[in-house]
Amino acid sequence: MGQTQSANENVQVFGERTKLIDETKKFYKNFNKLEQFYLKENFTALGKNVNGKVVWTEDTFCTFFGIPDVFRLSEFLFHSACRIGGCQNYGGIDYIGMVRFIAAYTGRYKNVWKDDECLWKIVYSWTIPNAPLRSSGSSLTSSLASSFNLVKLGKTNATRQPTIPCSVLISLFTLLLCIGDFQSGDVFADHISMLISSSVQEKRSYAMSLLRGVYPDPLAKSMSLKSVFLFLQSNSYALRRLGYLFEIIMYQRNQHPHRLVEQRSSGLLMDRYSLRPQLEMFIPPEVFSDCKFVHLFNSEQHGYSMSSLEKCSSSFSGNTLLLIRALPLDASHADRRARQFLQKIPPKNKSLSGMLMQDVIKDSSRELVFGAYITGQWKESASSGFGDQSTYLFNLRPYHQIFRATRVSNEYCFFDKHFGIAFGLENSKKKTVSLLRKDGVILYVDNMLDFGFFRHTSRGVYSMGRNFDDICYEEFFEIQEVELLGMKPLRKE
């Protein structure tokens, strides 16, 4: 009986390995000839014979990819590569595993895996299972398929999910933000020099906004696989930067002209507060590579005036990016106008179901950054709005979330000099304060560009944040700076 079971397991493992090889052959076709050459050349040159199999050991992998020690990610990425490559019990990563690892992180899995399937495999490779996994390729493959199908059906049990340590996620997010500063044409040595500079600490503080975007629990030591997957699913371009880094190293190129876009001049607020790397996680890459940012309006340059904003925005017909930097506002504020604003829009009370964000994040001195990606031309009107289903709201700090249009409405933005700027309101011929008392995902800026508020209580014109369905978030704020950037397509030569 035992021999029969063992034989069946061997057949299963052999079948899984055969499938792995067949998949890898398809991945390999997605690499061009030069990339195939460098991949094979580098692997052969550094491979070592371990138990009769040529592999890259952990030391070889970490030395070759050379992620600076300040991130403490080399060992983590090696184990991720082994799990994606199906090499957990080889004492290293073999050539098939290396091809699969590079393909997964650089987008060369197309026509073999779907995007969500690949993302799930990557995130799964980061986890620390609550229960020990058998190391055979078959059991890992079965676990992957089973867990992925359960998530798609919404049947996962949070207590049984594998988890990812928050410390690892912070380091990973910090690395992604640092890579976001790379410029086309820089040599790799300059990249590494930048990565180990003092800017890493600044990026680490911003990485906390990303971690809070996965789930805003400051006491959490780890995040569930599903939470991280859903966060990265909504920030679908986040991992591309990590793939770019692997490409630069593996293929010995100083630049990837079709991958790393040149950092052209962007908005003042975007530059000064390092917002671009976060924006590039969810705004399509072609927006940055095929468009030039045009400075339409900045409150510090043009004044805190709705008339100035209208004048600066009305003549631009393309898509725009609105950025708002602010500080929290509460009832103890000394300014009379601030108190009047708070009285005009009463806060929602705690009878609302769900967790209140204020119970999670209590630092009143924290910086707030809100914004919107707006498709179509701005128009000033008391009765009609603008934008389409490609418009979305976002919050970059103190937590990172995107709120996409739900197609409930065909008017997503309202701009009225007498009322203010509003996103997420019900369609109405007349805009009044009563509309702001409704539930939903709403961003409002008053007609003096002084104060505003953001509310996250239910699905409406915009969807709720991923993993935030049970959280009621309401923030009143005092505006520090407003910026509007136009996106002007570059001429094709």
From Swiss-Prot:
It is found in: Cytoplasm. SMART domains: TLDc. Transmembrane segments: none annotated. Its main location: cytoplasm. Residues 268-488 form the TLDc domain. One of its GO terms (cellular component) is cytoplasm. It comes from the Eukaryota. The keyword ATP-binding does not apply. InterPro entries: TLDc_dom. It holds the Pfam family TLD. Keywords: Cytoplasm. PANTHER family: NUCLEOLAR PROTEIN 7/ESTROGEN RECEPTOR COACTIVATOR-RELATED, RESTRICTION OF TELOMERE CAPPING PROTEIN 5. Belongs to the RTC5 family. May be involved in a process influencing telomere capping. This is Restriction of telomere capping protein 5.
